[in-house]
A protein has these predicted regions:
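Phosphate-handling catalytic cores of nucleic-acid transaction enzymes
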Residues: 311-313
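Short Gly/Pro-enriched turn/cap motifs at secondary-structure boundaries
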Residues: 307-308, 348
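Metal-dependent active-site segment of extracytoplasmic phospho-/sulfohydrolases and closely related
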Residues: 279-305
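Feature for exported/extracytoplasmic and membrane-associated proteins, marking the mature portion
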Residues: 1-283, 302, 316-382
């Protein structure tokens, strides 16, 4: 064991832009980076309860050996692929959120990620993302290049539902190259058509703002996630400002052959985060950035017969940044007492993490955005 202390939509190439006119809002001088671990990362092998005999009984083949765990406490440690994060843990810039979930969880990929993106209740259906509502409550400055940038996916996720200036792109260079050749997606509504010229100008302006071309000393990992992190840092390097960036690391739906797949993905994640920190330190932005992971759900504690795990509930997530108060938050799932479908009870409502960002990072009233009071998780320094 290793121990360590209603929008107008335009698309071109692989990019999509949604713009809506709105008044200038409050200044968002702190950035949120969301990292989606798409498919449902297995939290139990991410933060390993290496002293719990139930863990090894439920996972005779998949359990991480005690000697391989990167120890964080006398009970829990990280998957060995996450060893690059040990320095962040020692620096108290890594918060580990345990048992994250919500009441009456849904185990469908599509429905559960919708719940996370909209911050809705399990039986509530909304079209507007939680960030869409946040920026409606307190708009970002019009001088910003955009409210948010989605990298590596055409799905706007928490920025969906209209009313945001959101840019979704797969490749910055392609986005810039094709910006002036944009063609409108057919939409209905005279009000939208009346803004065509304004939107076209906004597209070109946004492309120009994203053309940071900052020459980083940081070396970024190869692969799609490393490229996405590099693109995110280029977006943040532009002086015009952006409130949120989301990047996606996909492949976590590990019903079969989980061990190798998750090890590779967690290594990609850890290496990407280390590069992200290095680049943001170069930009003098690390102390003004918080990184938050999320996924549609976790995995069941009991391994299946295919060398994998099935859809589960309570999960582990990370918050990282220069102003993060590092440590363990929440409580580890009680895997000795599982529900009838083989899942543990959650400890932290995921909307508490959102409330932390809204109330304590941006100064936006979380009750208005989330439709109720959710206790913030104190992973940010005062």
């Amino acid at each position: 064991m290793r121990a360590f202390g209603a929008a107008t939509a335009w698309s071109f190439g692989n990019a999509q832009i949604a713009f809506a006119a709105g008044p200038a809002g409050a200044s968002y001088n702190r950035v949120l980076i969301l990292v989606e671990l798409k498919g449902g990362n297995d939290g139990l092998n991410t933060l390993v309860p290496y002293t719990d005999p139930a863990y090894y009984a439920l996972r005779p083949k998949l359990a991480i050996k005690r000697d391989d765990v990167v120890q964080l406490s006398d009970r829990a440690g990280l998957h060995p692929s996450l060893e690059p994060l040990a320095a962040l843990w020692r620096e108290r810039q890594l918060a580990v959120l345990q048992g994250v979930g919500y009441p009456d969880p849904n185990l469908s990929h599509f429905r559960s990620i919708e719940i996370w993106d909209t911050a809705s209740n399990s039986a509530e259906y909304r079209q507007d993302g939680w960030l869409t509502r946040a920026f409606a409550a307190q708009p970002t400055p019009r001088a910003f290049a955009a409210d948010g940038v989605i990298i590596g996916s055409g799905d706007l996720g928490p920025l969906a539902g209209g009313g945001t200036r959101a840019i979704a792109l797969a490749n910055t260079e392609q986005f810039l190259r094709r910006a002036k050749l944009a063609q409108p997606v057919p939409i209905s509504g005279n009000a939208a058509l009346a803004h065509v010229q304004k939107v076209e100008a906004d597209i070109v302006q946004a492309a120009a703002h994203l053309d940071a071309r900052y020459q980083f000393r940081t070396e970024f990992p190869s692969g799609s996630f490393g490229s996405a992190v590099h693109t995110a840092c280029q977006v943040i390097a532009n002086p015009s400002g952006v409130a949120v960036v989301r990047v996606t690391l996909t492949g976590f739906d590990t019903h079969t052959n989980q061990a190798g797949t998750q090890a590779r993905l967690l290594k990609e994640f850890a290496d990407g985060v280390v590069a992200l920190k290095s680049a943001l330190v170069e930009l003098d932005k690390w102390n003004d950035t918080v990184v938050l992971t999320y996924a549609e759900f976790g995995r069941r504690p009991k391994e299946n017969v295919s060398g994998g795990t099935d859809h589960g509930t309570a999960n582990v997530h990370f918050a990282l940044g220069g102003r993060v108060a590092g440590g363990l938050y929440g409580s580890a799932p009680d895997i000795a007492r599982l529900s009838g479908d083989g899942n543990p009870t959650y400890a932290l409502d995921f909307r508490g993490a959102y409330a932390t960002v809204l109330d304590r990072w941006w100064g936006v009233d979380s009750r208005e955005v989330l439709g109720g009071r959710y206790a913030p998780i104190p992973f940010l320094k005062a």
